[in-house]
């Protein structure tokens, strides 16, 4: 299924299913169309137009009204039946950061496939065995033990540290679990959205272009007017959001607004 209406049909209490007097009673469905964008190479599309670049991600969420419960949708960058993310993007850490920042902050339930957190690769064209390789370590004779800090390579540790920090932050944030979403149509291949509830607000900026961008915060006044700063959840840096925000090429910024 690669259409939101098809997927929404299978979620419990679907209005689309009700047309045929059908209710699957399945509480959760998988966001295959978001995966289609991620797995289709969206983060390689540095030059954007009406059907290229980060607009593909934006358009996925414009159809959320079709789902009975958007908080109970499974979001993922890869799984046991797909190409590994790091196969598609050749281990590009910046693109991994962008994808995981997206998966961790949009509505729904994030799914991590084992090995994502250390940058594992696997080619579906080679066969299912290649995308389901053994996780390195745990057996005598394994040359690489990625179960421990000491056993990971420098590259594996880089992926692991980022993933751990991001998702440990997420697990404490009800604003991400059940908060509302406001998103804005991308400009210059930069996608900005907000997750918020009555007590918190998080601003997410994803720059999919290959150039540093200046993001005009005034465009998002509806969501920023009561805040003056944002804390970067990864670096801990505090950013003034009353002015334009600079964001590096091929990067994501997650800000807790204050």
Q: What kind of region is each of these model predictions?
A:
Residues 205-209:
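Asparagine-centered strand-capping/turn motif at beta-strand->loop junctions
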Residues 74-77, 102-105, 110-114, 120, ...:
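Structural recognition of the beta-strand scaffold that forms the well-ordered cores
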Residues 1-66, 91-93, 102, 119-165, ...:
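Active-site-proximal helices and loops of the catalytic beta/alpha 8
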């Amino acid at each position: 299924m690669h259409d939101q209406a098809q997927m929404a049909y299978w979620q419990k209490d679907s209005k689309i299913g009700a047309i045929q007097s059908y209710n699957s009673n399945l509480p959760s469905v998988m966001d295959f169309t978001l995966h289609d964008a991620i797995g289709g190479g969206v983060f390689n599309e540095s030059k954007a137009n009406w059907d290229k670049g980060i607009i593909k991600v934006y358009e996925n969420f414009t159809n959320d009204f079709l789902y009975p419960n958007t908080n109970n949708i499974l979001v993922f960058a890869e799984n046991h039946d797909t190409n590994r993310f790091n196969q598609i993007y050749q281990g590009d850490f910046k693109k991994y950061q962008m994808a995981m920042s997206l998966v961790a902050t949009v509505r729904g339930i994030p799914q991590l496939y084992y090995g994502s957190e250390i940058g594992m690769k696997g080619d579906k064209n080679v066969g299912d065995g290649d995308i389901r390789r053994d996780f390195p370590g745990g057996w005598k004779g394994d040359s690489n033990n990625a179960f421990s800090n000491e056993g990971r390579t420098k590259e594996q540790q880089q992926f692991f540290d980022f993933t751990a920090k991001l998702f440990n932050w997420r697990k404490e944030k009800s604003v991400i679990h059940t908060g509302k979403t406001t998103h804005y149509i991308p400009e210059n291949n930069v996608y900005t959205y907000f997750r918020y509830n009555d007590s918190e607000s998080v601003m997410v900026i994803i720059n999919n272009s290959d150039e540093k961008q200046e993001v005009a915060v005034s465009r998002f006044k509806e969501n920023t007017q009561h805040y003056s700063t944002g804390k970067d959840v990864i670096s801990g840096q505090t950013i003034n959001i009353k002015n334009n925000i600079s964001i590096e090429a091929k990067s994501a910024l997650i800000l807790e607004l204050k």
